[in-house]
Amino acid sequence: LEAEDYDTEINDAQKISLDEQSGDVKIKKAGTYQLSGTLKNGSVVVDAKAAVVRIVLDNAHIRSKNSAPVYVKQADKVIITLPKGTASSLKDTASYTVDEKEEPSAALFSKDDLTINGSGTLNITASYKNGIQCKDTLKLVDTNLNITAENDGIKVRDALLIYKGSYTVKAQGDGIVTTNEKEQGNLCIDQGTFAIEAQQDGLQSAGDLTIYDGVFTVTSGGGSVHRVDTGSALQPWGEFDDHDEAVQKSQKGIKAAKNMVLYKGSYTISSHDDALH
């Protein structure tokens, strides 16, 4: 983490009232933009090549009926700050009008580095696919996120770094996942409180997974009551009937494709498959 990832000071911000906006709010230059109010149907789009942009969500509520409520198309880095005592929200719908190949595919979608910090709260309801998706590096720094997603809760390609904070994720896919299998794809957590309920993997890393400390409550695939059954049943005349009810999708509690290191922490895991894999 860098110094600016911890910085939550709001200086020289350009204030934007979303109540006065219609359609998309476009950010094309470096700077700090403080958003408040409600955008009933539109997106905040960052298209600022090689610029560092800070977006302050000050009780901001963004709804989009046809795309991502927040879309970072290009930037050197975007920092989203949630000021103390504020509660903001992002909400999309079940369909986007954009071509899927052109993206986006999450309520908060970034093609470049993204940091979310500040002790405020961000509530995300993703009815299309993912809650948060970052195609570069995502850093979550001592913040509060509540995510409900039709697919993955938090999906990151290159690296995900989490330092402190509170994270509640309910996902029909993976809870928190990194995807870059060829290089990077690491997931690192240093403290924080996590409540994850996922139909697939709770926490999944395509690379190394390192947890220094934290409190984790993870339910995957409906929990251990929906167990994987790969045994054989005794039939009349002493014969066994082989049957396989193994899940087709991965439904593990905490999973790493490479190395997994857990230094400290409290773990309560109810998983359809392996608790740790």
Q: What annotation goes with each model-predicted range?
A:
Residues L1-H277:
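A composition-driven surface/loop motif
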